[in-house]
Amino acid sequence: MKQVFLWLIFVLAFHKLLAEKIGDIASVVGVRDNQLIGYGLVIGLNGTGDKSGSKFTMQSISNMLESVNVKISADDIKSKNVAAVMITASLPPFARQGDKIDIHISSIGDAKSIQGGTLVMTPLNAVDGNIYALAQGSITSGNSNNLLSANIINGATIEREVSYDLFHKNAMVLSLKNPNFKNAIQVQNALNKVFNKRIAMALDPKTIQITRPERFSMVEFLAIVQEIPINYSAKNKIIVDEKSGTIVSGVDIIVHPIVVTSQDITLKITKEPLNDSKNVQDLDSMSLDTAHNTLSSNGKNITIAGVMKALQKIGVSAKGIVSILQALKKSGAISAEMEIL
């Protein structure tokens, strides 16, 4: 039976201090995107639109025609060239009237395809019910395999701005993307050191309040804050996607010596040198006894990277690798957080 192996991607560091900028690890509270949504029609489809049985589509066509002084009952409309769609978009912070934003369109009826059609002018609303943008544009086929959704670059024009007055503010709040007591204090101390006064205070592991010095405007102040370097403490984390067989982990996460059994596989992890040279293979700086499923680090620490290479070498299935990782976590052999997707 063909074995299915996991791809191992090492992207997270093990308790290392990473050189980052404050702007990379924290966001300014209140300065964020706002989500927009709208309901509209895509016209000009070559018989691939919603069928006449889609009553909401036919009613929408009737309403659209009535807005241009053409009165016709929805029951009398027999068209397959129109599709009802939902439009979504993100309104960036500080966007101004006349700016363009991208939109995403998705069919909600029984259309076969919306490719090649034209989205007629559609208002986009926020959660407060107000219209913030108008969407309209042609849908090109591109390289998408999904015929029922599409993106239109610069497909909407902003008509209403979200007011946010930075100029008169004296204080703001930073929110860490990955809450951590140590990182919150490091951000606080770095800010106070750069400005040579107590302008920052960590309120909790995620939140740091900052006060603008009088000699700076708020825009100048935030520009300086975001560029300040910080030693960022990364978390130990292993992410397992069982469906795709992908594992994301730090290369330096240590696995303590242990014997773990899962299903029909037993793996022994040790620091002691292996004596049986017949079945021992070199695996980077480690040794692997394929006959007894024993992995030795030859006196050094064994990392999760080494364990993964050994498991693949002895032919453990994807399901078996996930089970062994879970067993290692449960036994305390690894101290990293584990997230199963």
Curated annotation (Swiss-Prot):
Gene Ontology BP, a term: bacterial-type flagellum-dependent cell motility
Coiled coil: none
Top-level lineage group: Bacteria
A GO CC term assigned to this protein in UniProt: bacterial-type flagellum basal body, distal rod, P ring
Compartments it resides in: Periplasm; Bacterial flagellum basal body
UniProt xrefs under InterPro entries: Flag_FlgI
GO molecular function: structural molecule activity
Keywords: Bacterial flagellum, Periplasm, Signal
Cleaved signal peptide residues: 1-19
Family from the record: Belongs to the FlgI family.
The protein's role, per its UniProt record: Assembles around the rod to form the L-ring and probably protects the motor/basal body from shearing forces during rotation.
Subunit structure: The basal body constitutes a major portion of the flagellar organelle and consists of four rings (L,P,S, and M) mounted on a central rod.
Listed name of the protein: Flagellar P-ring protein
Species whose genome carries this gene: Helicobacter acinonychis (strain Sheeba)
Taxon lineage: Bacteria, Pseudomonadati, Campylobacterota, Epsilonproteobacteria, Campylobacterales
